[in-house]
Amino acid sequence: MGKTQLAPGFRFHPTDVELVRYYLKRKILGKKLLVDAIAEVDIYKFEPPDLPDMSFIRSGDLKWHFFCPREKKYASGVRANRATECGYWKTTGKERPVLCNSEVVGKIKTLVYHFGKSPRGERTDWVMHEYRLDDKVLTQMNVPQDTYVVCVLFKKDGPGPRNGAQYGAPFKEEDWSDEEVRTDVPSTSNPTNLLEPSKETTLALTAPDDSNKDCFGGMISESCVSDFLPATTNTTSELPHPSDAATTPMSTAPLAETVQTPNNDDLYSMLDLFDDDEEFLGFNNNEVRYDPGVSAPVCLEEEGIFNGLPELSSMPRTASYDLVENSELYLELQDLTAPLNPQTGLQDLTAPFNPQTGLQDLTAPFNHQTGLQDHTAPFNPQTGLQDHTAPFNHQTGLQDLTAPFNPQTGLQDLTAPFNPQTGLHDLTSPFNPQTGLQDLTAPLNPQTGNRNDPRSSSFLYNQGHFDFSGGNDDDPYGFSASMRHRPKM
């Protein structure tokens, strides 16, 4: 932080509680300070006359504040090392407590600088108050509180304390003579004042009249009226004498001509500075203005808003008003009892519907493409209607497992098992895979991968039929031959 220079009378003057509970505590805990007014300096490495130049605040006061890290004299001890290169700081008196709401929050120790070697050093006028934190909450949390102390350094006048001693900077008028000269307050002999918008000007009347106060309770300054002044205004204005304020009428002239403060209220006086015809284009009472290109609102009579509406009393009292015909955006409560189009995402899950019409069809199951169907009845996928004579199509994955069907027609065929290509077949009876019809006179073809009869290892197969010419009449299936050629175990 750069050093800050304060005007005369402004100084950093915290109380003991503020030094301990705010500045020192936040420094120990590593928290940010709103104002970085205390420099961190190891004061025991410097001589007292060198420390004032290290302060952040250049107020010229004879009291300086520093954050000082604690350095122990011995590594295993608790005593602090307070020796400098040319002298040492010696404790004097007893520690004083810092009380906050009758609770001890810190301790103050007074030290005096001695020039030379201990214990024969020469006492000087440099005094330091060392503030340390003593917080019970931090003690219970085992937070170290001796990492930093606040040192307040000052130089007293002569030996011993002085009652009412002040350590503010001695005021020297020549130090402030080169500051920017502001406009002086007009005297009673010259009641006029020049108003220059380009400078910071304070307008004031000499008499203690309330009329010279602005809306914030202070003097009228250029900050209140600078926004109202034209940028090119260079005309000076003359303020009336306070004695003539009561008899001076309110003026509606622009601010560049006359500035007055009548009626003890500057807010109204500033509003009177404007010309309503030029500054504000408002509407007068009951006045309608015409602006080209802007359509003016139509002013209707009290009952005029009902013009053009039909007579509701003559209309039929029915509940079927076709307000929006053939509109999918229009929805009534009665529509919730029937399924809607699946594309809208609204449907009645308790009833099937025809996906092509979007209407409920109690005779047909749901369309398999919508994922909504009646699992209790099959349907023809081409028509979308229920067909009790046919099972579900195997392509849809929905079928009646209690009956086979012809995959080419999609209709139930009670005389034929399921097609093996579909993976759906009747395991209780064989069938001819070429015809798709049940053939009770022949076993299954072993090349199809279907169930093989135990007799299939010894019969002659000819296009899906038995060939009885290969065995004798008494043993048409060749059981004797199979037993004769049975390998030995």
UniProtKB/Swiss-Prot annotation:
Segments of this protein annotated with the region PEST-like: 183-198
Region feature (9 X 13 AA tandem repeat of L-[QH]-D-[LH]-T-[AS]-P-[FL]-N-[PH]-QTG)? 333-449
> Which tissues is it found in, per the record?
Expressed in the epidermal cells of the root apical region.
Any single Gene Ontology cellular-component annotation:
nucleus
Feature: compositional bias, Polar residues: 185-195, 429-461
Q: Which residues form the NAC domain?
A: 6-156
Q: Which Pfam families match?
A: NAM
Keywords attached to this Swiss-Prot or TrEMBL record, sorted alphabetically, are: DNA-binding, Nucleus, Repeat, Transcription, Transcription regulation
Region of interest: Disordered = 162-195, 416-489
- According to the entry, DNA is bound by residues in 105-162
For the keyword Isomerase, the answer is no
Residue ranges annotated as compositionally biased, kind Basic and acidic residues, are: 171-183
Q: Which InterPro entries match?
A: NAC-dom (IPR003441), NAC_dom_sf (IPR036093)
Q: Does the keyword DNA-binding apply?
A: yes
Q: Which domain of life is it from?
A: Eukaryota
List where in the cell it is found: Nucleus
Provide a Gene Ontology MF annotation, just one.
transcription cis-regulatory region binding
Q: Where are the sequence repeats?
A: 333-345, 346-358, 359-371, 372-384, 385-397, 398-410, 411-423, 424-436, 437-449
Q: Which PANTHER family match?
A: NAC DOMAIN-CONTAINING PROTEIN 86-LIKE, PROTEIN CUP-SHAPED COTYLEDON 2-RELATED
Subunit field text: Interacts with NAC030/VND7.
Q: Domain description from the entry?
A: The NAC domain includes a DNA binding domain and a dimerization domain.
* Cited function: Transcriptional regulator that binds specific DNA sequences on the promoter regions of target genes.
Full protein name: NAC domain-containing protein 82
Q: What is the lineage of its organism?
A: Eukaryota, Viridiplantae, Streptophyta, Embryophyta, Tracheophyta
